[in-house]
Amino acid sequence: MPRRREVPKREILPDPKFGNVELSKFMNVIMEGGKKAVAERIIYGALDLISQKQPEKDALEVFVTAINNVKPMVEVKSRRVGGANYQVPVEVRPVRRLALSMRWIKEAARKRGEKSMAQRLANELMEATEGRGGAMKRRDEVHRMAEANKAFSHFRF
């Protein structure tokens, strides 16, 4: 690793429609091949679908709740001790927590069966808000792994 100064974190501008930084980050996660306009259309389309299906709830609120529900608290990291690999549970840093939740929601939405990506994303976000869906399943799986390997938590990093 270079021993030079630490590279400063780039400031991400809030998205143009809602003025939300998390939504802007999610747009960058959804984006493929530099096609930001396509990612923007998918996300805003999904939020429109959410507001149509659940008019009593704010679409942005549903998005934020879904992201917060999917955030993992602990994960496991492999640590080699005396010729054996142990899965050591560690707490997830806040920045990684957000990144993982966004990535898992994107992956779960991609695996769904609906026609358009906007529909898949809308349904995945609504399910994550209710504590269901592929992304929540992934988070629970990670938490279960950490719980199962709690005995190795004294092998700190």
From Swiss-Prot:
Keyword Acetylation part of the UniProt annotation: no
Database matches in SUPFAM superfamilies: Ribosomal protein S7
GO-annotated molecular function: rRNA binding; structural constituent of ribosome; tRNA binding
Lineage: superkingdom: Bacteria
Keywords in alphabetical order: Ribonucleoprotein, Ribosomal protein, RNA-binding, rRNA-binding, tRNA-binding
Signal peptide limits: none
InterPro entries named in the record: Ribosomal_uS7 (IPR000235), Ribosomal_uS7_bac/org-type (IPR005717), Ribosomal_uS7_CS (IPR020606), Ribosomal_uS7_dom (IPR023798), Ribosomal_uS7_dom_sf (IPR036823)
One Pfam family here: Ribosomal_S7
CDD domains membership: uS7_Bacteria (cd14869)
Quaternary state and interactors: Part of the 30S ribosomal subunit. Contacts proteins S9 and S11.
Family to which this protein belongs: Belongs to the universal ribosomal protein uS7 family.
NCBIfam families: rpsG_bact
UniProt function note: One of the primary rRNA binding proteins, it binds directly to 16S rRNA where it nucleates assembly of the head domain of the 30S subunit. Is located at the subunit interface close to the decoding center, probably blocks exit of the E-site tRNA.
Protein name (Swiss-Prot/TrEMBL): Small ribosomal subunit protein uS7
Native species: Acidovorax ebreus (strain TPSY)
